[in-house]
Amino acid sequence: MAWRDRRGALRAILEGSACVRPASVYDAISIRIADDLRFPLGMFGGSVASLAILGDPDSALITLTELAEQMRRMARAAALPVLVDADHGYGNALNVRRTVQELEAAGCAGLTIEDTLLPQAYGEAKPQLISSEEGLGKINAALDARLDPSLVIIGRTGACSISSLDDAIERAVAYEAAGVDALFFTGVKARDQLQAISAATRLPIVLGSPPAELADWEYLAAQRVRIAVQGHAPIAAATEAVFRTLSALRDGAAPQQLTGLATPELMDRVTRASLVDERGARFLGLARE
């Protein structure tokens, strides 16, 4: 699927009437599994990128180059549209332009730019926001940097949990007026908050990790929520599986005694082994087994 087709698929989700729950993806294998399972969308989060690439918690240490290269690997591996959490754009508004250029070239379907002050400021234990003016400048820079008009750019605010609901709405309305394609809110905890956001804005809404009170997909869809991100369980599950397997091997288990491993058939499927064999036969004169 060409980049524009993937971006069109994401736009179709935003223009639709359902609330989609994307697959958390972070490498070539995870995106292929999500694609094979027919998820409509992948989400490449900043926290999961930090885990997968650096083995670090979500502490804003990853670089744009590392993020874009990982996105490029995933885009080559499967045709699933991917929405990338581009954090703060890796600097000021001029850095945001570069971020959009690199992620667009890497094949993402869309990206989010947020207003959290990153990296963490000296002496500040709690998250902080950049000013509304700086946040709007970043959004305008992102929109200006977009070469493919089908690339989805989403303005994200954490104001609900950091400052106030009113501040979140004010920032979102400004991003909407600037021309973003959707609005991403984190920290929304209650229905009355979401309803206030929905009433004050017009664009499709993306929610980050909605709590149990909001985990009603029909209700969310009625409030114009088109994407609800549900955290990053796959990488946690993979980490547990590797830990258990290596622990068993360390304790003397023989490989044939291990349980919970992918079958050879599943490994062939996610590595696209039959396609590699086919290409070997076509281009290298190799007999297919």
Swiss-Prot record:
Its cofactor is Mg(2+). Mg(2+) binds at residue 85. CDD domains: ICL_PEPM. One of its GO terms (molecular function) is methylisocitrate lyase activity. Keywords: Decarboxylase, Lyase, Magnesium, Metal-binding. InterPro entries: ICL/PEPM (IPR039556), Oxaloacetate_deCOase_bac (IPR023687), Pyrv/PenolPyrv_kinase-like_dom (IPR015813), Pyrv_kinase-like_dom_sf (IPR040442). Substrate binds at residues 47, 156, 232. The keyword NAD does not apply. Binds 1 Mg(2+) ion per subunit. GO terms for biological process: oxaloacetate metabolic process; propionate catabolic process, 2-methylcitrate cycle; pyruvate biosynthetic process. Transmembrane segments: none annotated. It catalyses: oxaloacetate + H(+) = pyruvate + CO2. Its EC number is 4.1.1.112. Pfam families: PEP_mutase. Homotetramer; dimer of dimers. Catalyzes the decarboxylation of oxaloacetate into pyruvate. Seems to play a role in maintaining cellular concentrations of bicarbonate and pyruvate. Belongs to the isocitrate lyase/PEP mutase superfamily. Oxaloacetate decarboxylase family. This is Oxaloacetate decarboxylase. It comes from Rhodopseudomonas palustris (strain HaA2).
